[in-house]
From Swiss-Prot:
Chief location of this protein within or outside the cell: nucleus
Keyword terms: DNA-binding, Nucleus, Transcription, Transcription regulation
Name of the protein this chain belongs to: Putative transcription factor bHLH041
InterPro entries: bHLH92/bHLH041-like, bHLH95_bHLH, bHLH_dom, DUF7049, DUF7050, HLH_DNA-bd_sf
Complex and partners: Homodimer.
Pfam assignment, any one: HLH
Gene this protein is translated from: BHLH41
PROSITE patterns linked: BHLH (PS50888)
GO molecular function: DNA binding; DNA-binding transcription factor activity; protein dimerization activity
Amino acid sequence: MMHLILSCSYLISMDGYYNEASEEPSSSSSSGSLARSLFHEYRQSVIPLQNGHVPSMAFMNNLPYVEIRPQESQRLAFNDTQRLFYQMKIEASLREWFPEDFNRKSSPANSDYLRPPHYPSSSSSSLSPNNISEYSSLLFPLIPKPSTTTEAVNVPVLPPLAPINMIHPQHQEPLFRNRQREEEAMTQAILAVLTGPSSPPSTSSSPQRKGRATAFKRYYSMISDRGRAPLPSVRKQSMMTRAMSFYNRLNINQRERFTRENATTHGEGSGGSGGGGRYTSGPSATQLQHMISERKRREKLNESFQALRSLLPPGTKKDKASVLSIAREQLSSLQGEISKLLERNREVEAKLAGEREIENDLRPEERFNVRIRHIPESTSRERTLDLRVVLRGDIIRVDDLMIRLLEFLKQINNVSLVSIEARTLARAEGDTSIVLVISLRLKIEGEWDESAFQEAVRRVVADLAH
């Protein structure tokens, strides 16, 4: 419904929409006409801006809509038209949820008082408080009194309540008494369902009624048995008693199962020992300790798999076989990378160590240098050594130096060449000289004069350097 603020103190209705077809059944056309009349009367009323009423509360609090609960409709409504209109909508909702109860109560003999009088067709007709009080019996559904006979269930319809004046609070006491009676009937029905026998009631004890299927079950048939004496064979139990009985039986069944398992185990393990027939009521302390240890071991194993899975690439399968297979492949690949890096590290370290030794061996004023380094794996009869020749100059012919050294070694009988390596080193910026390094690994057999050999090599290099 759309409202307009008038002079910042009152609200008047500009437009409204009333959905009658989806909520009012075809059999209650009089009730629908009453609700529609209340709706038009509600639209024509002028409502002051007060925060404790609707729709002023929505405008003052800037709310798109306000949900009115049934217990708040008396307090939030501003006038009697609003109250009766809201409670007519509540009755329509209850009729939609409980169609069978309303069909049962709306018999022709007792439905005349629900039919509203005819209003004149002029636009000046309105609902007075006296007319509104005539339909106050529609505010809440009437609850039938339980029957005290053991016959078939005949649900009586209560007579219409006295008219209730919606203005004075002292006239609302019958309404609250009716509500209290309804709540008591609901409570008795729930208790009857919970404490009743497990066998379903006879279908012949209640009349068959046709209506729309709902998710709720009828309870008035149980209310009618309140005055009936309980059968001796039926034992009424509360929900707590039934729960305790269930868990007691569950505990007994578990103990019996443990006893059978232990009896089977003892019969197989100690059949010839003569000690059979002695059963325990549960697992022993050793078995419990073993079970606890096994559970902890599984938990640690699952945690280890979780940690290993977090280290693998994203997209890896989560099953344990896939995790182990991919982890093994990753470890093999990483081990290969580590081996390559270690080999490269050794090469770089050897190169740096050789360059440092060369820089230490060759002084700035020297043009060449010859040095011999013994290998620790040598023996007294067969020795292995490295002969290093460092030569510096502007123009150096590497092939001539290699030929001279090889010719010299060929002349010595007890010296054999194992390997040879030659390389050049770049000098600092601005220095045009070249440093040539030749490393020869030699094997010496028998007697050998190291100083004479080193001096002979120096003469060969000196002849080429000059």
